[in-house]
Amino acid sequence: HLWQGVAGKIENGEEAWQTAIRELKEETGLDPLNMFVADHTSSFYEVKGNRINIIPVFGIEVNSKEVLLSEEHVDYKWVDFESARKTLVWNGQRKGLEAVYEMITNSDDRMRWSKIEL
């Protein structure tokens, strides 16, 4: 097993941000309060299909800490930023987390410019 954030594939007719919300609800039972596009895209090579995937990263504020875990997962935990950085296996996921954290903790206009109206 490995630890990672909520993730999933875009279904036909979905926008990437809609996929993030659907996966959030399916995997955790949580609802989004606020959402923004992070200043980072993650990418990885997938041998099956011989393709490079480019994945947008989103920051989502949720309505609760009470998670209803889906059957595709075995556990969850809430952790602080440093613990999350140390726990994530993939560099792309760490960089995405760092981008979200940096946008949340800095007082600049990127949060306003990248906000997604729900």
Question: How should each PLM-predicted stretch be described?
Answer:
Residues 5, 40-42, 117:
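Short linear capping/connector segments at secondary-structure termini
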Residues 25, 29-65:
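Active-site segment of metal-dependent pyrophosphate-handling enzymes
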